[in-house]
Amino acid sequence: MDVNPTLLFLKVPAQNAISTTFPYTGDPPYSHGTGTGYTMDTVNRTHQYSEKGKWTTNTETGAPQLNPIDGPLPEDNEPSGYAQTDCVLEAMAFLEESHPGIFENSCLETMEVVQQTRVDKLTQGRQTYDWTLNRNQPAATALANTIEVFRSNGLTANESGRLIDFLKDVMESMDKEEMEITTHFQRKRRVRDNMTKKMVTQRTIGKKKQRLNKRSYLIRALTLNTMTKDAERGKLKRRAIATPGMQIRGFVYFVETLARSICEKLEQSGLPVGGNEKKAKLANVVRKMMTNSQDTELSFTITGDNTKWNENQNPRMFLAMITYITRNQPEWFRNVLSIAPIMFSNKMARLGKGYMFESKSMKLRTQIPTEMLASIDLKYFNEPTRKKIEKIRPLLIDGTASLSPGMMMGMFNMLSTVLGVSILNLGQKRYTKTTYWWDGLQSSDDFALIVNAPDHEGIQAGVDRFYRTCKLVGINMSKKKSYINRTGTFEFTSFFYRYGFVANFSMELPSFGVSGINESADMSIGVTVIKNNMINNDLGPATAQMALQLFIKDYRYTYRCHRGDTQIQTRRSFELKKLWEQTRSKAGLLVSDGGPNLYNIRNLHIPEVCLKWELMDEDYQGRLCNPLNPFVSHKEIESVNNAVVMPAHGPAKSMEYDAVATTHSWIPKRNRSILNTSQRGILEDEQMYQKCCNLFEKFFPSSSYRRPVGISSMVEAMVSRARIDARIDFESGRIKKEEFAEIMKICSTIEELRRQK
């Protein structure tokens, strides 16, 4: 069918055509190899922005540190990190004046959180720098290792399970003269394989004890490991991101809790809300500015971009902000919150894996670890790398670089938003004391500035004043990358505003399609994505119906489950045809079993099994939903699962979908090759931890417990719970006397074994 494309736009308002400008088909770029170069760039750039600051030496670690605070006022438009303490404090004071009681209330809310948070909060999150092994690990493993080391060094406050008590241990660990840790290492040896008679490398894993003196321990505790940010579109160069270790994480969490609580109360803040709630909040600010600028005033909006936001922020400024925000609070609370910025003022950046060299002629490859960069002859490197290394050398200690200024990506998003909003807040007429005034939106480093004034000169003056005020607190608006427009058209955090936020449905395109988890989850995720886009992104009924048909087609090709009566031949068609022929009610077969598709845009919210249940043959029902089916390793049956979907822009989003466990909810087995590497010991620890937690969850309904810490308490809790449950079941006649006696006997045996151990 030939369509004249101009017909598509006949009755469409211009802003709705945004979805046709979508540039992001295909895969985003991923980084390969080492991130060392990117990290060195970050460290060198950060120091360059603050180069006129004062140099000092950290007495504990011997690290050279640069402090740009209260440095020279800028005389040009170059980005700089010379924030002025008194200006930041004044901005905070005015913010409080405009929002009476905001800091007080947020402190009270945070204090409650601090006293209630369990240490398992730190198991959330992906890769975390594990200081005991000096590399990245899943968060739960890194936490378990840290606690294990703390306990073996006599730090036991963490046993209460409260995060605040774990942090007491962290503080105490920094005063210790030495810490003993267990590290994993691997031995390689060449042996002859009996079968093939070839030489093979055998690896064995060992654990060994190692003592760290105070200085080495402090360096590790203050280290942020770095990686390359993956899947960033629209950039030529990759960049580095940081993962902090367990010592820093807990403190950061509390600071961000406080800042989040403040952001929730600020109408200009684009955090912590998202999606439609965020759009509504932002639309209010725009509406306010437009209604106030009736006929007498002009109103312009800047779609803003800041130069290197976090490299010009400074932890010392955040310390000043926290000191002010918590000024009437109890001493212990002020101390807990000030530790994160203090640790960040003394942070060390781990430079990653180092450089890989290869000689084409001799077919040799060798890794130069970052520890060697301080001493290696620079003649082996190319010119740009040589310059980088020369610049960073004075900052190197044990393969990490001292990085006092700057914040590293994504650490204090909420708190830096508070700083940005405090400058937007100064735009009220009572503060500008002139004819122009401004307001705007801030979300981490992204901002939109709305300026109102009687004439163009006033607008220009307002923008200049805003620009200079920002400079005073270390925010550098980029004049090259920001643009100004009549209010009513601007972009903020990838939302495009034109007389209201425009639904840019094409941003969600990458998340349409088959996820590849398993047949059951993929079907559910696929229809949920379509449903969500109908709700949130103006996906119209006709387009949705088409998306659904394309999805089903895609799904059938992926899992080779074409309808039982189709002519298409695949590896599965023989079995599916047989099933089709012996099924009485063919409409009841799932799509993944060669059945027809019963979905349309009205019933996307119903899981397929429920949609077809009444139509299924009885024996098919019995096979499909049979927990005893030996071929299925069942996931836990939860009513809601989470899938990770990738929009074109911004971070991966978590999306909930209904999960009905059937024989199609299989889990692919893990790749076995990991078992031959040094990760093996860690993997076993992790599986052990998972097993314990899963077992524990069987005993306690999810409402009544928080994930435990420390094995000792878990066993006792499970035994006593088993006894109580058994007694109740016995008295109500649910179990027989013999079963009750057997349970009691098992419980006693477990306790006996623990006593012997």
Curated annotation (Swiss-Prot):
In the record, the note on similarity to other proteins reads: Belongs to the influenza viruses polymerase PB1 family.
Q: Which residues form the RdRp catalytic domain?
A: 286-483
Its job:
RNA-dependent RNA polymerase which is responsible for replication and transcription of virus RNA segments. The transcription of viral mRNAs occurs by a unique mechanism called cap-snatching. 5' methylated caps of cellular mRNAs are cleaved after 10-13 nucleotides by PA. In turn, these short capped RNAs are used as primers by PB1 for transcription of viral mRNAs. During virus replication, PB1 initiates RNA synthesis and copy vRNA into complementary RNA (cRNA) which in turn serves as a template for the production of more vRNAs.
Name the Gene Ontology molecular function terms of this record.
nucleotide binding; RNA binding; RNA-directed RNA polymerase activity
Q: Name one GO cellular component term.
A: host cell nucleus
**What PROSITE patterns does the record point to?**
RDRP_SSRNA_NEG_SEG
Which segment of this protein is annotated as the motif Nuclear localization signal?
Answer: 187-195, 203-216
Predominant location of this chain? host cell
* Species classification: Viruses, Riboviria, Orthornavirae, Negarnaviricota, Polyploviricotina
Could you give the subunit structure recorded for this chain? Influenza RNA polymerase is composed of three subunits: PB1, PB2 and PA. Interacts (via N-terminus) with PA (via C-terminus). Interacts (via C-terminus) with PB2 (via N-terminus); this interaction is essential for transcription initiation.
The organism encoding this protein is: Influenza A virus (strain A/Turkey/Wisconsin/1/1966 H9N2)
- Record's keyword terms, sorted: Eukaryotic host gene expression shutoff by virus, Eukaryotic host transcription shutoff by virus, Host cytoplasm, Host gene expression shutoff by virus, Host nucleus, Host-virus interaction, Inhibition of host RNA polymerase II by virus, Nucleotide-binding, Nucleotidyltransferase, Phosphoprotein, RNA-directed RNA polymerase, Transferase, Viral RNA replication, Viral transcription
Q: Which Pfam families match?
A: Flu_PB1
Q: Quick one: where's region Disordered?
A: 50-82
Cite the Gene3D superfamilies for this sequence: 6.10.140.720
Q: Where in the cell is it found?
A: Host nucleus; Host cytoplasm
According to its UniProt record, how is this protein modified after translation?
Answer: Phosphorylated by host PRKCA.
The protein's name in its UniProt record: RNA-directed RNA polymerase catalytic subunit
Which InterPro entries does this UniProt record tie to the protein? RNA-dir_pol_NSvirus, RNA_pol_PB1_influenza
- Which superkingdom is the protein from? Viruses
Q: Where is this region: Promoter-binding site?
A: 249-256
GO BP: any one term: viral RNA genome replication
